[in-house]
A protein has these predicted regions:
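Glycine- and aromatic-enriched membrane insertion/assembly motifs of diderm outer-membrane
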Residues: 87-89
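Contiguous, well-ordered beta-strand patches that form the walls/edges
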Residues: 68-71, 91-145
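Short, exposed beta-strand-loop hairpins at the edges of beta-sheets
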Residues: 148-155
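Amphipathic/hydrophobic helical signal segments and adjacent flexible N-terminal regions
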Residues: 1-85, 165-181
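Edge beta-strands of extracellular beta-sandwich domains
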Residues: 158-164
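A short, structured loop/turn motif at beta-sheet edges
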Residues: 58, 80-83, 122-127, 143-148, ...
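Residues located in well-ordered beta-strands
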Residues: 64-66, 120, 159
Length: 181
């Protein structure tokens, strides 16, 4: 189910430059997945109020996205960004990382089944590339293609659309959208 409430859909406005920012991404504690996952209710955005400008090479992936084509049709994720920091919240997990190519500041958390994950993240050619266990090759990538995002997860390729703020408090278009794809 898509998150309810505009705070999930409208990211904090970013400062024009680092000199004018009020809150840096590094000043916000790293979020982790709660024991057993986050359940039915989407957690509050981690980077709310953080106005650090995105890194120059970072694609702006911020928003709530839904897979509309590919093997994971229906999957919904929220992506937050500030500076080099990226937080991806989906399927009960919160993956908070700094895209600096290190495992230390990458994702050190659990997958949706509770198994441990350790992933380095890096921005490369306007993509967010993820390297589980710091492998040489990116196993997961996200990048923009026009108004859509492409999410490659191993051999699987998915196309996502950014969801808009629900005007009636509920994302009613999600109820019938599966018929449209």
């Amino acid at each position: 189910m898509a998150p309810q409430g505009q705070e999930h859909y409208i990211p904090t406005a970013l400062a024009v430059d680092s000199a004018s920012m009020q809150t840096s991404a590094d000043s916000i504690p790293v979020a982790t997945t709660p024991e057993g996952g986050w359940g039915e209710t989407w957690p509050a955005p981690v980077l709310a109020g953080c106005d650090e400008p995105l890194a120059d090479e970072a694609p702006d992936l911020r928003g709530v996205w839904k897979v509309v084509d590919g093997p994971f049709v229906g999957h919904i994720e929220r992506i937050e960004q500030a500076g080099r920091r990226v937080v991806i919240t989906a399927t009960g997990v919160i993956h908070d990382m700094v895209a600096d190519g290190t495992l230390e500041r990458g994702v050190n958390d659990v997958d949706p089944t509770g198994g441990a994950v350790s992933v380095a993240a890096r921005f490369n050619d306007s993509r967010l590339d993820l390297f589980p266990n710091n492998m040489r090759r990116a196993v997961v990538t996200r990048f923009l293609d026009g108004d859509e995002m492409v999410w490659r997860y191993g051999p699987y390729r998915n196309r996502l659309r950014r969801l808009e703020v629900p005007t009636d408090g509920v994302h009613t278009e999600l109820l019938n959208e599966a018929d449209d794809v």
